[in-house]
């Protein structure tokens, strides 16, 4: 239930495969082999987009601008999954054994494959 936890980890994962839900999307997108971190950190996975907040209706409006997740080139996110996690992302600073790999954001709530629908 998105209203019980105000923040939800938000990440681009390595794979766009959602055949087994979010379990098949792989780890966070990390083409440069860095540790997990906050979106503004120098040392972070490219797919680390921090947290989003959903309203009481469960809807979150998200607008992301980030130089580490381009739509073209070697580090393109096209074809990868964008995942909303049930728990907040501790941004690599929580001291938990998973902080430096996943932000300890645990299970996924929902996912979607990311792609270009058309060119305008």
Curated annotation (Swiss-Prot):
It is an enzyme of class 1 (oxidoreductase). Residues 33-47 have a biased composition (Basic and acidic residues). It catalyses: 2 superoxide + 2 H(+) = H2O2 + O2. Disulfide bonds join 22-112. It holds the Pfam family Sod_Cu. Cu cation binds at residues 11, 13, 28, 85. Binds 1 copper ion per subunit. It is found in: Cytoplasm. GO terms for molecular function: copper ion binding; superoxide dismutase activity. Its EC number is 1.15.1.1. The keyword Lipid biosynthesis does not apply. Zn(2+) binds at residues 28, 36, 45, 48. GO terms for cellular component: cytoplasm. Its main location: cytoplasm. Its cofactor is Cu cation; Zn(2+). SUPFAM superfamilies: Cu,Zn superoxide dismutase-like. It comes from the Eukaryota. Destroys radicals which are normally produced within the cells and which are toxic to biological systems. Belongs to the Cu-Zn superoxide dismutase family. Homodimer. This is Superoxide dismutase [Cu-Zn].
């Amino acid at each position: 239930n998105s209203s019980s936890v105000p923040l939800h980890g938000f990440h681009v994962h390595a794979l766009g495969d959602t055949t087994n839900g979010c379990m098949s999307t792989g780890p966070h997108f990390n083409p440069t082999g860095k540790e997990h971190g906050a979106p503004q950190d120098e040392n972070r996975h490219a797919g680390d987009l921090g947290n989003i907040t959903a309203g009481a209706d469960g809807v979150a409006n998200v607008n992301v601008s980030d130089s580490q997740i381009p739509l073209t080139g070697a580090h393109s996110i096209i074809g990868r999954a964008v995942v909303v996690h049930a728990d907040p992302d501790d941004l690599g600073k929580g001291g938990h054994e998973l902080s430096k790999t996943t932000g300890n954001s645990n299970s996924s709530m929902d996912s979607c494959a990311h792609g270009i629908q058309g060119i305008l």
